[in-house]
From Swiss-Prot:
Lineage, highest ranks first: Eukaryota, Fungi, Dikarya, Basidiomycota, Agaricomycotina
Domain of life: Eukaryota
Subcellular location(s) of the protein: Endoplasmic reticulum membrane
Gene Ontology CC entries for this record: signal peptidase complex
Keyword Endoplasmic reticulum: yes
EC number(s) on file: 3.4.21.89
Record-given protein name: Signal peptidase complex catalytic subunit SEC11
Xref: PROSITE patterns: SPASE_I_1
Region called C-terminal short (CTS) helix, residue ranges: 174-185
Main function: Catalytic component of the signal peptidase complex (SPC) which catalyzes the cleavage of N-terminal signal sequences from nascent proteins as they are translocated into the lumen of the endoplasmic reticulum. Specifically cleaves N-terminal signal peptides that contain a hydrophobic alpha-helix (h-region) shorter than 18-20 amino acids.
Family: Belongs to the peptidase S26B family.
Record key words, sorted: Endoplasmic reticulum, Hydrolase, Membrane, Protease, Signal-anchor, Transmembrane, Transmembrane helix
Length: 188
């Protein structure tokens, strides 16, 4: 089945295969560094997310790729589209801020130090009938620590690649295997 590939693998020699594996590892490490660098620049643990449901239609559709930032100094306003993550839930949610409340800092020392007011938020999907209170798992409001970021831009339908990879894991592993094999057998 893979006899030609095995012959090519033997013909290339150990050093060449090792060099190709090192090049492949460099590409992977570079991708991770770029991802972490984007996270630091945008102050977001996940600066790029994919819309996984239709709850934000017509603003965003399933498969849209969203670009996020999370500036510390900026307060969220009603109407902002945010991505938040509740503790215990592994999927971030993209919804619009419906209400905000500023809570002044507690204690005299905090006020004198000039700490900013903390912000509480209530969100709702544009395509949903009710707010997200039931999604908060016992919380009354979202706090700033739950927010992954504010949507700054998007690319329509580009995220369908991610959705397809998650819906069909065999496709993901097949693509990774083929890419790895091609990287090892490349003759540069």
């Amino acid at each position: 089945m893979f006899t030609e590939e095995i012959k090519a693998f033997r013909r290339l020699g150990f050093r060449h295969v090792l060099l190709q594996a090192l090049n492949f590892a460099t590409v992977i490490a570079s991708g991770l560094m770029i991802w972490k660098g984007l996270g630091i620049i945008t102050n977001s643990e996940s600066p790029i997310v994919v819309v996984l449901s239709g709850s934000m239609e017509p603003a965003f559709y399933r498969g849209d790729l969203l670009f996020l930032t999370n500036p510390v100094s900026e307060q969220y306003k009603t109407g902002d589209i945010t991505v938040y993550k509740i503790p215990g839930a592994d999927i971030p949610i993209v919804h619009r801020v419906l209400e905000t409340h500023d809570v002044p800092p507690k204690g005299r020392k905090a006020k004198e130090a000039g700490e900013p007011a903390s912000q509480l938020m209530l969100t709702k999907g544009d395509n949903n009938y009710v707010d997200d209170l039931e999604l908060y798992q016992g919380l009354q409001w979202l706090e700033r620590k739950h927010i992954v970021g504010k949507v700054r831009g998007f690319l329509p339908y580009v995220g369908y690649v991610t959705i397809a990879m998650n819906d069909f894991p065999q496709l993901k592993y097949a693509l990774l295997g083929v890419l790895g094999l091609l990287a090892l057998l490349q003759r540069e």
